Amino acid sequence: MSPLTLSRRSAARSRASRGLSLALLCAGCAIAPAAHADPGYYVVTVYDNEGLRNADLRYWTVKMPNRPEVVWPEVGFGYGVSSRWTTELFASWIGSSQMPMQLSTLNWQNDVLLTQGELPLDIALHAQLIANQLDAGGSAIEWGPVLQTDVGRTQLNGNVFLDHGYGGFENGPTLMKYQWQIRHRWKPWLHFGAQGFGELGPWDHWLPRDKQSHRAGPAAFTTIRLDDKQAFLVQAAYLFGSVYGRDARMFTMRAQFVF
């Protein structure tokens, strides 16, 4: 299903978490575990986008009390290779009032639909390769299942991802993270709901509860259709909670031109 069918099934996105540790370090904080993937916090959803191209602009922030806000602008281009496979290349920068903007990672994301309406629950496989462009170098891979279902006019998403770093991304334990979304189709041009993200630590030995990350908050989505194949899609969320046990606020925004 194409992103242009948002009145029937909507779209959103994400990735996951090494940038959080860098954000805390930039803010002058120490952090125990290093998360591997330089993230963008957008809930991953997968649709039949065959033949559609996607120009992608993303922007997200982390703000801790009495610390400078750290920002991550991102730019990408995606393509629906087939009815089941969507691929995207994008770059992520990082900066703050105390650190000049610099290229952080280059990323290649692939999402493959395993079911297309045969079951009450849609299932897909997400995989992302991350190449660190900062001094430490190295790379990371993130992968895991993407789950989606509908209850009336409300779409429910739940994803669990693992990521593992190599080289400068610290070849340590494989880490586990989660993301979820509730999206209600109120009007064809306006959907609202909530999103949540978290990092649990090593997949087989979670961090203590007070060292984990859990954030959630309200989200809004809108679509401006130009014709049957072209549209602007915009989503934004404001998240409250913690980053590895420290209080933090996050803002995420994503604007796409689908054509």
Identify the role of each PLM range.
Residues 36-259:
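Transmembrane beta-barrel domains of Gram-negative outer membranes and organellar outer membranes
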